[in-house]
Structures are given as C-alpha cells and as structure tokens.
C-alpha cells in the first residue's frame, strides 16, 4: 500500500478493527457465563462491523487478504490476495448472520451501536457493489439480491425501525443530528461537555475546517478573523472545494439539496445573548463606504448602506469539561432592534436563504449558482460572485484574480456544510476547530438508490424511476414544479 498518510491509515485501521472483530467472534465460544442473548447480539455486532471494514477495503484497494483469525506475534511475510468472490462471500455471510441476530433497537439504548437495519442496509450495498464485479449467488445475480434486500427494507421500514424524512431539509437539520431517524449506521461524535468527550481524543475531528472557505480573506469588508469566528468556526484549512462537475450536477432553481449541502452566502454575527458583541458592533454590522463599493463592484447607490448580522451566537459554558459552545439563532430579515426576543431558530443556520433576495441586507458576499449579469449585480447591495467565474476553462479553480479590482474573491468557494455542526452538545469551542456531531455512514436514501439501480440493471426502468422520484420529490424546491416535470 501507499505510504501516503490518509490511504495508509485507512488500510491499517480497517485491519486493526477487523482484528478486534475476529477476537470477539472467535472467542465467543469460550464464554460460559452471562446472558447468551447478549452474547449473540455482541457477536452479531462484530460480524456486521467486520463486513463493513472488509467492504471498505475491497472498495478502495481491490483484492485484499482475508483474515478471519485473531493476530499473533508471528508475522505473515508473504500475504496472498483473496479473490473478489472470497471477499464478498465473507461480507455477505457476515451481514446475513448479523441481520438475523441483531435487534431493531440498539443494545443498552446506545443509538451508535449497529442494529438490524444497519446490517440489512450494508447487505444491500454489498450486493450492489459485488454486482458491479459480475458476482452471483447460487446462480442468482447480485443485482437480484440487492433488489430483494433493498425492497424488503423499504417495504418494511417501520418494522425495522427505519425511516425516510419527507423533506430533505430535515436530514440536515441541526436538531436531528443526534438520533437522526434516517440514519442506518453512523459514526457517533461525543456529546460535548460529557466525560466521554473530555477524556476521549476528539481534537482531530476538524473536517469542517477543510470544507469551508474563509470569508476573512476579504478582511476589509469581513473583518472577523478565523480564530475569532464564533459562527463558522476556525475555517483555516480550506482544502476541499466542490469540483466544477459536482457544482453542475445541481440545478439549484429546483433542487434545495444545493443550499442544504453548500453554504454560498457569508455573513457576520452578533453575540448579544452572550454579552460579547452588540448588534451594531463594527465587527457585526458593516457600513458600505465608497472605497468598499468601488473595490468589490457594488453599485455606488449603496454607499452608506448597512449590512447587518445574519445570526446571533450565544456562548454556552461547558464548565469543568471544556470551553464554550457557540450556538446560533437567526435575526429575521428586516429586524434591526437587536432584541434577542426576536431571534428565531432555524433548521440549520449554515443553510442560507436561496436564492438570495436582491434586497438582502444580512450577507456580505454571495456566490451565485445562477449567472448574474452586471445589471443584475447592480441591484444588490452586497458582493456578488458568479460561481462559474471561479473556474478556468479546464474546470479547475482559478488561482489568481477574477475581477478588475484584483480582490481575493477568487479564494472563495461553495462550502460543504454537512460537517459544520451548530447545536448544543455538538460544538466544542476551545479553539473553534472541533465539532463533534454524528456523521452518516449509511442512511435510508441510499437504499432507495440501490433499489433503483438494481431495478434498472434488471430491465425494470419504470420501477427504478418510482424509487428515484421519492427522493427527487422531497428535494424539489416547489412541489408544483416537480409535478410539472
């Protein structure tokens, strides 16, 4: 394997986890005391996890070496690659046995532990991936098996304690992060302020810092530095931006997954609730000067106009278990009193209004998915950047100025907001880099996609469309447009 840290770490850690699973599975027969039903579930959990890790390995590295026994001090100097059939046979068998023995509710009420729906979801995924390798089971195509498992999970969602939200916004609502009803399998982040958080090693969970751009690159109009950004967090890495291809996959006129995936309008914030920053503080409310308007291409008629904070951020002290959490509420448009009683809770404060209105006065910069002409930009009292202008002809991001004034707007990009958590218990603010929400490994929507792909592969295009349309409808911005299309 490569010595590159990320890929090597994935490979090594997957095998380390497999070794633990092997120990649980193989030592279970030696356990003579305790509740046999509990033991059965623990073994089923280990089989589900072992199958998952092997699925990760075969997906990323191809034919790896199957190991089903606990490691010893003896090193295997010449490991042999197992065949696709051997690897998938183990994955399928583990998941079938796990699904048979797991309950629909998690052991000890710990929602982070795998249940029957997790095993079934992964089984459908494994069949679909194996089908792509041309595999079959007793003469039956893996596509047929993927169809059967996925459709059973869909048809019997309630009995498996599975769920699909009617509105895609609810999937990413901050209040739904913990115990998300659509989740089949998660990587659970610890509740900030608890002993599990305090004594665990969770400082490395900084994913959002890599997927967000830094609006402070426009420091004269966005004066709050990354180390003091209590709203977005310390977004100082800025490595991962969506490709031109990915951006073009969205038709944001109809698809509200766009703003529920990417933040494209950036604002300042007040901290009235915390008593740290008033509503009209110079770092919360900006007045457009002639110089700022000239520099950023804002029409001169907006000189003297104020841009107000979009949110107010509260500071909630964690006491002896850490620093503060910074939870945001939204100032309604047109509300300038600074009265915290007027604040409203929204599903996700990082989901900006879309499309951004011409008269919006709570955002400093807007990255527009739809191309805005100069005349259209002139109607807006904030910085407008066409996302298409961020890309060169070869589809790569430009690395130099995109405007005549040579501003740093070229450093901005649509920012993936799915790892930027903002709820009490999911945001540890000691250095504004660590956020500890739950992350999906698999959710129910994927099962619909698997069912659709399997049906299409088996020649049932109309049935495939039915499954796809369930997902399309809940993502559609206006139901009337969905019905018309």
Regions found by a protein language model. Name each.
Residues 14, 88, 140-143, 461:
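TPR-repeat structural position
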Residues 1-61, 76-89, 95-111, 385, ...:
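Conserved, well-structured interaction surfaces
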Residues 1, 125-380:
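An aromatic- and glycine-enriched ligand-binding surface/loop that stacks and positions planar moieties
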């Amino acid at each position: 394997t490569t010595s590159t840290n990320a890929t090597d770490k994935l490979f090594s850690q997957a095998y380390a986890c497999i070794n633990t699973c092997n120990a649980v599975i193989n030592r279970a027969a030696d356990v003579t005391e305790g509740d046999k039903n509990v033991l059965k579930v623990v073994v089923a959990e280990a089989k589900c996890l072992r199958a998952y890790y092997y699925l990760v390995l075969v997906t990323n590295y191809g034919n790896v070496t199957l190991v089903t026994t606990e490691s010893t001090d003896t090193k295997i100097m010449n490991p042999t690659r197992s065949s696709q059939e051997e690897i998938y046979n183990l994955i399928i068998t583990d998941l079938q046995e796990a699904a048979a023995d797991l309950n629909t509710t998690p052991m000890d009420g710990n929602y982070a532990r795998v249940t029957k729906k997790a095993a079934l979801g992964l089984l459908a995924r494994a069949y679909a991936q194996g089908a792509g390798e041309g595999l079959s089971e007793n003469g039956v195509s893996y596509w047929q098996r993927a169809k059967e498992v996925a459709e059973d999970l869909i048809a019997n969602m309630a009995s498996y304690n599975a769920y699909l939200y009617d509105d895609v916004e609810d999937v990413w609502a901050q209040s739904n992060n913990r115990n998300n009803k659509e989740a089949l399998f998660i990587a659970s982040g610890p509740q900030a302020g608890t002993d599990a958080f305090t004594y665990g090693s969770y400082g490395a969970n900084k994913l959002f810092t890599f997927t967000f751009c830094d609006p402070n690159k426009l420091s004269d109009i966005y004066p709050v530095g990354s180390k003091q950004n209590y709203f977005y967090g310390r977004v100082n890495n800025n490595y991962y931006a969506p490709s031109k291809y990915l951006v073009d996959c969205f038709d944001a006129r109809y698809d509200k997954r766009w703003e529920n995936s990417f933040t494209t309008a950036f604002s300042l914030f007040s901290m009235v609730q915390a008593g740290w920053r008033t509503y009209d503080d110079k770092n919360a409310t900006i007045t457009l000067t002639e110089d700022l308007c000239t520099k950023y291409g804002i029409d001169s008629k907006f000189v003297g106009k104020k841009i107000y904070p979009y949110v107010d951020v509260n500071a909630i002290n964690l006491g002896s278990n850490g620093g503060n959490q910074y939870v945001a509420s939204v100032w309604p448009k047109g509300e300038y009193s600074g009265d915290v009683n007027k604040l409203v809770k929204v599903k996700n404060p990082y989901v900006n209004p879309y499309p951004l209105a011409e008269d919006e006065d709570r955002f400093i910069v807007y990255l527009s998915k739809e191309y805005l002409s100069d005349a259209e930009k002139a109607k807006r009292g904030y910085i407008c950047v066409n996302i298409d202008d961020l890309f060169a002809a070869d589809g790569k991001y430009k690395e130099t100025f995109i405007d005549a004034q040579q501003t740093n707007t070229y450093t901005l990009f649509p920012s993936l907001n799915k790892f930027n958590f903002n709820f009490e218990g999911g945001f540890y603010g000691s250095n504004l880099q660590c956020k500890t929400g739950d992350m999906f490994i698999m959710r129910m929507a994927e099962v619909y996609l698997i069912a659709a792909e399997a049906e299409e592969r088996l020649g049932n295009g109309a049935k495939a469309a039915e499954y796809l349309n369930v997902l399309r409808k809940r993502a559609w911005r206006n139901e009337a447009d969905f019905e018309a299309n």
